[in-house]
From Swiss-Prot:
GO cellular component labels: mitochondrial inner membrane; mitochondrion
Role description: Retinol dehydrogenase with a clear preference for NADP. Oxidizes all-trans-retinol, but seems to reduce all-trans-retinal with much higher efficiency. Has no activity toward steroids.
Residues where NADP(+) binds: G45, A46, N47, T48, G49, I50, G51
Gene, per the UniProt record: RDH13
Modified residues (N-acetylserine): S2
SUPFAM superfamilies according to UniProt: NAD(P)-binding Rossmann-fold domains
Family: Belongs to the short-chain dehydrogenases/reductases (SDR) family.
Alphabetical GO biological process terms: eye photoreceptor cell development; response to high light intensity; retina layer formation; retinal metabolic process
Active-site residues annotated for this sequence: Y200
Compartment(s) of residence: Mitochondrion inner membrane
Superkingdom of origin: Eukaryota
Pathway: Cofactor metabolism; retinol metabolism
NCBIfam families in the record: PRK06197.1
Name of protein: Retinol dehydrogenase 13
Length: 331
């Protein structure tokens, strides 16, 4: 029997080391134990993946959670799941289609009318590397949903967020933003040959630029805004890439994926952290990679690009009277 002890001990050591390495590489659990009783939280794209897990985490902490999703059947099912698991009955589903400016305006109008406050807005929903689709209003899908939809939604809810201050806005970006570039001559991919990867990277860079500019405009308001990269997660977001479902991925790359790819539960920890951590109460305009604050790509910190993107985004979504007043941009 003793001859098996050494191999078993070695195997256990290796397995333990692998688990510790995975925890180190993929981040870890939200270090904050703060609760949010009585606070109203909106999570977009919360019917599945990171969004659902984020809503679950915040429901456990006592929040009044609003799941904002396009597919109401899935959204209602997710809300029911979360209520059952957390015994928090203040979890509700609302319809929001970020590919429709009309839907965004209708959603915001109902929130403003029916909700006493909005303490936390988590712009989680996203589209990744889809075919060359367009939104209801004719925008390239990834730029339209990932950036423009959340840009409009956030601006429409700013007065409610300011009235609820201190409040927080969390924008989910991606490490892919470092490969992005804002092409002001063709934001909508009307003249260039469509490149779904480049379009995705552009949309994620736009989110970080939006975060930076919004933070500047919100100084002194009691509302903070930060962007984050949640990590690579095994969710429906990557369904258009095909990589998670391929035989090559599941066999040859299996060990690497196990090490680097997060579960939705783990990928929801950064959003949870930015939403509740007391030590982040006054942190704004920053970019987080997982649970750690890091410098974004150089273009993401270009103030002139951020101002120009804001002005163009406002024009595209018809935001004639932004909630946050600003001096005219220099010509």
């Amino acid at each position: 029997m003793s001859r098996y002890l050494l191999p078993l001990s070695a195997l256990g050591t290796v397995a333990g080391a692998a688990v510790l390495l995975k925890d180190y590489v993929t981040g870890g659990a939200c270090p904050s134990k703060a609760t949010i009783p009585g606070k109203t939280v909106i999570v977009t794209g919360a019917n599945t993946g990171i969004g659902k897990q984020t809503a679950l985490e915040l429901a456990r902490r006592g929040g009044n959670i609003i799941l904002a999703c396009r597919d109401m059947e899935k959204c209602e099912a997710a809300a029911k799941d979360i209520r059952g698991e957390t015994l928090n009955h203040h979890v509700n589903a609302r319809h929001l289609d970020l590919a429709s400016l009309k839907s965004i305006r209708e959603f915001a109008a109902k929130i403003i009318e029916e909700e006493e406050r909005v303490d936390i807005l988590i712009n989680n929903a996203g589209v990744m590397r889809c075919p060359h689709w367009t939104t209801e209003d004719g925008f390239e899908m990834q730029f339209g949903v990932n950036h423009l939809g959340h840009f409009l939604l956030t601006n429409l809810l700013l007065d409610k967020l300011k009235a609820s201050a201190p409040s927080r806005i969390i924008n989910l970006s991606s490490l892919a933003h470092v490969a992005g570039h804002i092409d002001f001559d063709d934001l909508n991919w009307q003249t260039r040959k469509y490149n779904t990867k480049a379009a995705y990277c552009q949309s994620k860079l736009a989110i970080v630029l939006f975060t930076k500019e919004l933070s500047r405009r919100l100084q002194g308001s009691g509302v903070t805004v930060n962007a984050l990269h949640p990590g690579v997660a095994r969710t429906e977001l990557g369904r258009h890439t095909g990589i998670h479902g391929s035989t090559f991925s599941s066999t040859t790359l299996g060990p690497i994926f196990w090490l680097l790819v997060k579960s939705p539960e783990l990928a929801a920890q950064p959003s949870t952290y930015l939403a509740v951590a007391e030590e982040l109460a006054d942190v704004s305009g920053k970019y987080f990679d997982g649970l750690k604050q890091k410098a974004p790509a150089p273009e993401a910190e270009d103030e002139e690009v951020a101002r120009r993107l804001w002005a163009e985004s406002a024009r595209l979504v018809g935001l004639e009277a932004p909630s946050v007043r600003e001096q005219p941009l220099p010509r």
